[in-house]
Design a protein with these regions (language model features):
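Gly/Ser/Thr-rich active-site loops/lids in small-molecule metabolic enzymes
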Residues: 34-44, 81, 86-115
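Glycine-rich, charged/polar anion/phosphate-binding loops
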Residues: 45-48, 55-65, 84-91, 128-131, ...
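Short coil/turn connectors at secondary-structure junctions
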Residues: 9-11, 71-73, 98-103, 171
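Catalytic core of DAGKc-family lipid kinases
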Residues: 1-68, 72-74
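ATP/nucleoside-binding phosphotransfer catalytic cores, i.e., glycine-rich phosphate-binding loops
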Residues: 63-65, 95-100, 107-171
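A residue-level signal for conserved active-site and pocket-lining positions in enzyme catalytic cores
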Residues: 26, 76, 105, 157
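Glycine-rich phosphate/pyrophosphate-binding beta-alpha loops
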Residues: 19, 23, 75-90
């Protein structure tokens, strides 16, 4: 069974994940570059975004009824799969075939630009989770993420703009 996500009043199924934060920003910027007829370099977009353009919102994340509030959120994806964005192991312990059907909420938060830029490459090996002061992982069947201002997110790589809230129901 595939998980469902409700965004801007629309319900969709997804296979891998719902990404909010710098990844949604990268998809938004990448879409604009591709629409202009150029090739998007997502690594370059991410680095420039981390250093100069992406503005970290605050968010509240509720997993199975337990709400936590986060300041300066860099990432807040909810994953059915383990990887996204060209090989980033964002949810290292997530099992797509989990018999319980859980999804994983990952929040990278609270850090400054340079610390985030230093830790960000460790996502490719799933080692970012060692930075518990700025990365929190929670598993559940019902996840709601709310932001303090509209932002872009991606659902299996498809960009959705002006989102202030998304809700995931595990399959």
């Amino acid at each position: 069974n595939l998980p469902r996500v409700v965004v801007n009043g629309e319900e969709r199924l997804f296979i891998n994940g719902v990404g909010y934060g710098i990844d949604g920003y990268c998809c938004e910027v990448g879409d604009k570059i591709v629409a202009s007829g150029k090739e998007a370099n997502y690594t370059s977009i991410a680095i420039k975004g981390l250093l100069f353009h992406y503005k970290t919102p605050d968010a509240s994340v509720t997993v199975d009824g337990v709400t936590k509030k986060y300041k300066k959120v860099w990432l807040a994806p909810t994953m059915k799969g383990r990887y996204y964005g060209g090989g980033m192991m964002i949810a290292p312990k997530q099992n797509r075939d989990d018999p319980e059907g859980f999804v994983t909420s990952v929040v990278m938060f609270g850090s400054g630009k340079l610390k985030t830029l230093m830790v960000f490459p460790s996502i490719f090996k799933g080692e970012h989770v060692r930075h518990s002061e700025m990365v929190e992982i929670r598993k559940g069947k019902h996840v709601t993420v709310e932001f303090d201002r509209p932002t872009a997110l991606q659902i299996d790589g498809e960009t959705v703009l002006n989102v202030t809230r998304y809700e995931v129901f595990a399959g």
